[in-house]
């Protein structure tokens, strides 16, 4: 059985050059890292194999050099999505995978053109599929906002979330995800569209989509936002939950793109 070939809609979504895709990696001590990885594409010459360009992925590459386990989220503009796990295999400096990455519109016309190499991932499992109705997005965003107003998830610990980051996470029309390391040791990435500022040092969300996994209380988590303007930030911290409400006490914040891709800003 082929995970990619036997899952309706997944290959077409992966082939979309602008389809939002996220790659989660882990450090040796189990800290998750999750970033947009739009360059993820299916390898047309091998089953259940993905390639990606080494482009603005500094922390991810460092993690892959120490632990090959990855989590992947693919989500379409219609909010249909797939949650995968996989194993990083290798980097290739030359060959068809590199050529295909370099010929993509994302890299061909980018001011920061060029990839160092192409990474190869073997898909291991399909963890979940989902489809999020638009009305559910509105409902969950409102419920998360209500939780924040009521003070849920606020605390004295953590670092203040900078205003530019708060402004982006306050947007409803953006792709937001949540990642953590599962008991199997593999990172898991799920949609968290309702993620938004809570207190000065927290982010809150509402888990209204049935069937999706969620991190246990106290877990080390990472969340990332990708806006329509290709702005991205990543926040890391500690997870707490009460019913369907969840919160992150933020410990670290990173920029996702130029001029400081992967650089810590808080």
Q: For each predicted feature, which ranges?
A:
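Binding-site signature for planar aromatic cofactors or substrates
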Residues: 1-266
């Amino acid at each position: 059985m082929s995970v990619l070939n036997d899952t309706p809609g997944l290959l077409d979504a992966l082939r979309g050059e602008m389809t939002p895709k996220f790659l989660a990696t882990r450090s040796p001590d189990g800290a998750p890292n999750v970033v947009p990885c739009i360059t993820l594409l299916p390898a047309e010459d091998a089953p259940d194999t993905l390639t990606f360009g080494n482009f603005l992925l500094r922390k991810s590459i460092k993690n892959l050099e120490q632990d090959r386990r990855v989590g992947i989220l693919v989500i379409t503009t219609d909010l249909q999505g797939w949650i995968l796990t996989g194993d990083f295999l290798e980097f290739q400096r030359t060959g068809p995978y590199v050529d295909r990455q370099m010929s993509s519109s994302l890299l061909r016309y980018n001011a920061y053109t060029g990839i160092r190499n192409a990474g190869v991932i073997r898909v291991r499992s399909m963890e979940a599929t989902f489809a999020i109705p638009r009305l559910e997005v509105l409902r969950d965003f409102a419920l998360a906002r209500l939780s924040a107003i009521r003070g849920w998830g606020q605390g004295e610990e953590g670092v203040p979330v900078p205003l530019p980051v708060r402004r982006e996470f306050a947007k409803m029309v953006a792709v937001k995800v949540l990642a953590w390391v599962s008991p199997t040791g593999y990172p898991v990435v799920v949609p968290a569209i309702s993620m938004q500022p809570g207190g000065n040092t927290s982010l809150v969300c509402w888990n209204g989509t049935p069937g999706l996994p969620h991190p246990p209380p106290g877990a080390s988590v990472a969340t990332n936002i990708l806006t329509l303007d290709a702005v991205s930030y990543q926040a890391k911290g500690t997870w707490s939950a009460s019913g369907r409400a969840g919160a992150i006490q933020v410990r670290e914040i990173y920029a996702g793109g130029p001029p400081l891709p992967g650089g810590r800003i808080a």
